[in-house]
């Protein structure tokens, strides 16, 4: 017969991390225009080893998911201009020149902040680059929404420091 431990059955107080307490640092993009990020995670896949009429599975290569980033687009400093400056490191539309990955890949820091402003968790996104950008919609009928920019970022990998 199992004996229950009191720490397992009684509520233990804790302070949860909340979604709206974060600060992101991306070189060239002001932190205060970063509205949100989603999609941090990975997929390890699987490798199936067949043998006669049975099989065994082992993990495959770890592949980090793309992340979605949403920015506000203020008039000044222009969020669209900040994004396009990063895009121009990937590809210059006027000349057709592509950039080296050393120039356009960036390390991004996502600091999760506690209730008193202390950093309680830190993710570092290594080798981030822009895959897609959506500069939003302009519509005469909508007078209640701020303009947003949606980005999809590819990356090499992430590190959870603490």
Walk through the language-model features, giving the residues of each.
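Glycine-rich, low-complexity intrinsically disordered segments
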Residues: 1-162
């Amino acid at each position: 017969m199992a004996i229950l431990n009191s720490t397992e059955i009684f509520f233990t107080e804790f302070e949860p991390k909340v979604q709206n307490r974060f600060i992101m640092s991306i070189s060239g993009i002001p932190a205060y225009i970063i509205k949100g990020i989603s999609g941090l995670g990975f997929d390890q896949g699987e490798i199936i080893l067949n043998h006669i009429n049975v099989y065994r599975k082992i993990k495959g290569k770890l592949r980090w998911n793309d992340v979605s980033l949403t920015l506000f687009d203020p008039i000044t400093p222009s969020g669209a201009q900040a994004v396009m400056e990063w895009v121009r490191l990937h590809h210059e539309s006027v000349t057709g020149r592509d950039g080296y990955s050393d120039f356009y890949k960036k390390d991004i820091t996502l600091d999760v902040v506690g209730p008193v402003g202390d950093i309680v968790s830190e993710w570092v996104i290594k080798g981030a680059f822009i895959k897609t950008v959506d500069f939003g919609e302009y519509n005469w009928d909508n007078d209640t929404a701020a303009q947003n920019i949606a980005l999809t970022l590819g990356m090499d990998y992430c590190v959870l420091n603490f």
